C-alpha cells in the first residue's frame, strides 16, 4: 500500500482487521518497524483525536514524529495554482511539499473541504498535490471527502461489539448551526458498503450524500418534516 486515502487502498478488509486486532493485543509488537523513520503530520485544520491517536500509533511503531501546523508556526502557504504571489502567503504549497518530503519517510495530511468550489473539494486538490509531489507515502488524516482513519476505527469497533455475524448499521445525522464537511459520513458509508452489513442511511429528503458514497446502502427518508424536527428540537 503506497498511499491510504480510502477503503480501496487497504486491500483485503478481513486481513486488515485481523492485523488491527493483533496489534491491539500487543501495541508495541512492531516497535522496531519504525526505527530511524520519521512521520510528518501536516495539519491545515485543527484536530484532537486524530492528532493524538496518529502520533501515539507512530510512537508505538518506534517512529520519530514531526508535527507541522500550517498557518500556525509555519509560513502561510498559497494552495491555488497560477496565482500572483503578492498576497499574505509568502510560499507556495508546490514549493513547500518537496521540502517537507526531504525530512520524513511518511506524510499524514489533514485538509478539510473549503466550501468554495465543490469540484476542487471532491478532487482532493491539496491531498493529491502531496501524493504527486512529496515523493513519500501519504495517508489522509481527514480530507475534503473522506476520513479513512476514523472509518477504519469505526469498523473495528463494530466488529468488536457486534452481536450477530451480519449486523444492521444505521447512519443518520441531525441539524447543525453551521455547514460541516461531509468527509465523515462519506467515508463511513464507503467503508460500510465494503462489508456485508445490512447498512441503512436515513435522513430528511434533501440531505443526500453524493451517490458514489451512498453506494448500495438502503436509503430511508424520515417522514417527519424538517420544520417539525426543528420545532421539536427547540423544545428539548
Which role does the model predict for each range below?
Residues 64-65, 71-72, 106, 137, ...:
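Residue-level detector of anion-binding/catalytic polar loops
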Residues 1-48, 52:
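Positively charged, low-complexity intrinsically disordered leader regions
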Residues 70-73, 112-114, 143-144, 204-206:
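Short, ordered loop/turn segments at secondary-structure junctions
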Residues 61, 133-134, 195:
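Short, structured coil segments at secondary-structure junctions
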Residues 48-53, 159-225:
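Glycine-rich phosphate/diphosphate-binding loop of Rossmann-like nucleotide-binding domains
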Residues 227-234:
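Conserved small/polar residues in nucleotide/adenosyl-binding loops
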Residues 48-94, 99:
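Active-site cofactor/substrate anionic-group-binding motifs, chiefly glycine-
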Residues 89, 97-98, 105-191:
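Anion-binding alpha/beta catalytic cores of soluble intermediary-metabolism enzymes, centered on
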Amino acid at each position: 500500500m503506497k498511499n491510504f486515502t480510502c477503503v480501496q487502498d487497504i486491500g483485503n478488509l478481513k486481513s486488515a482487521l485481523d492485523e488491527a486486532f493483533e496489534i491491539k493485543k500487543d501495541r508495541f509488537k512492531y516497535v522496531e518497524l519504525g526505527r530511524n523513520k520519521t512521520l510528518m503530520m501536516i495539519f491545515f485544520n485543527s484536530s484532537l483525536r486524530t492528532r493524538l491517536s496518529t502520533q501515539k500509533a507512530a510512537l508505538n511503531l518506534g517512529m520519530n514524529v514531526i508535527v507541522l501546523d500550517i498557518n500556525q508556526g509555519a509560513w502561510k502557504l498559497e494552495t491555488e495554482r497560477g496565482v500572483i504571489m503578492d498576497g499574505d502567503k509568502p510560499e507556495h504549497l508546490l514549493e513547500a511539499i518537496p521540502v517537507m518530503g526531504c525530512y520524513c519517510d511518511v506524510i499524514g495530511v489533514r485538509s478539510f473541504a473549503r466550501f468554495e468550489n465543490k469540484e476542487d473539494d471532491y478532487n482532493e486538490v491539496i491531498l493529491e498535490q502531496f501524493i504527486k509531489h512529496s515523493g513519500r507515502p501519504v495517508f489522509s488524516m481527514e480530507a475534503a471527502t473522506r476520513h479513512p482513519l476514523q472509518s477504519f476505527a469505526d469498523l473495528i469497533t463494530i466488529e468488536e461489539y457486534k452481536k450477530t455475524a451480519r449486523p444492521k448499521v444505521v447512519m443518520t445525522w441531525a441539524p447543525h448551526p453551521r455547514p460541516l464537511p461531509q468527509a465523515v459520513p462519506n467515508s463511513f458509508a464507503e467503508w460500510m458498503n465494503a462489508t456485508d452489513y445490512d447498512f441503512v442511511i436515513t435522513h430528511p429528503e434533501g440531505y443526500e450524500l453524493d451517490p458514489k458514497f451512498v453506494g448500495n446502502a438502503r436509503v430511508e427518508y424520515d417522514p417527519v418534516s424538517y420544520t417539525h424536527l426543528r420545532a421539536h428540537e427547540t423544545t428539548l
